[in-house]
Regions:
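Active-site region of PLP-dependent enzymes
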Residues: 161-167, 174-256
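Active-site nucleotide-sugar/metal-binding loop of Leloir-type enzymes
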Residues: 120-122, 170-175
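PLP-dependent aminotransferase-like
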Residues: 69-158, 165
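Phosphate-binding glycine-rich loop
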Residues: 31-78, 92-104, 169
């Protein structure tokens, strides 16, 4: 195998001394699992995406799984998603016992082909799960029109789109439920982690239960649903807050 003199990374996380300081202070506080930084990060991220509610989770993949279940999508239901995307999209659908309906890609945008999408809608279709690919936003005007016409949920996977916009509106603000990833190669990172945003309080409350093992409200160990341990840590939130402070300059640098 030929060895190259220089290694050019696909991505390198942009971390600075403010990030180190934020995490260090949180470590010294002793609040390394739960803590106030989580709620602060959720509030600021909700504001940033123009959504009412935000909930931190352990990864972008976890966010997708919870998003599906929060909408009561399950056995016998179909969810349309692009064939060209990370496996997490289809996995989230399958793990919730629904059926992924794969649609090919538009060669100009790398996103889902809208003409083919329309042909795949059936009486069993409950939602569209649409990631924006490689920084190119989907045509959200057409997508939202389709969802309204067929009464479908829109799960917007904005994992690669933090800070990106479609017609001056922030990506991740279009979905009934929208998800984000904070993996090391994303615009802002917490090492691992994800976020789910929505304007629906009932859905938000269900998301918070599902990510925390669906503990009972009155009797903690009476679980009224099957949830996951998909929690986010106070340490991650501290890093996320610091990163979010400079999202504009991060996106600007990527454009260059």
């Amino acid at each position: 195998m030929k060895k190259f003199k220089y290694f050019i990374p696909v991505n390198r996380p942009l971390l600075n001394e403010n990030d180190v300081s934020s995490v260090s202070l949180t470590v010294k506080s002793g609040w390394i699992s739960s803590g106030s930084k989580i709620a602060e990060f959720e509030k600021r991220f909700a504001n940033y995406t123009n959504k009412k509610y935000a909930s931190c989770v352990s990864s972008g993949s976890a966010a997708l799984e919870i998003a599906i279940k929060s909408l009561n999508i399950g056995y016998g239901d179909e969810v349309i998603t692009p064939a060209f995307s990370i496996i997490s999209n289809s996995n989230a659908i399958i793990k919730n016992l629904a059926k992924p309906i794969l649609v090919d890609t538009d060669l100009d945008t790398w996103n889902i082909d809208i003409k083919q999408l329309k042909k795949k809608i059936s009486s069993k279709t409950k939602a569209l799960m649409l990631p924006h690919i490689y920084g190119f936003p989907n045509d959200m005007d057409k997508i939202q029109k389709i969802c309204r016409l067929h009464k479908l949920y829109l799960i917007e996977d904005a994992s690669e789109m933090i800070g990106q916009k479609y017609k001056k509106k922030i990506c991740g603000s279009f979905g009934d439920v929208s998800t984000f990833s904070f993996y090391a190669n994303k615009h802002i990172t917490t090492g691992e982690g994800g976020m789910i945003v929505t304007n629906n309080k009932k859905i938000h409350n269900k998301i918070n239960k599902l990510k925390n093992l669906s503990f009972g409200k009155k009797n903690r160990f009476n679980h009224d649903d099957i949830g996951w341990n998909y929690r986010f840590t106070n340490l991650q939130a501290a890093l996320g807050l610091s990163q979010l402070n400079r999202i504009k300059q991060i996106v600007k640098k990527k454009y260059k």
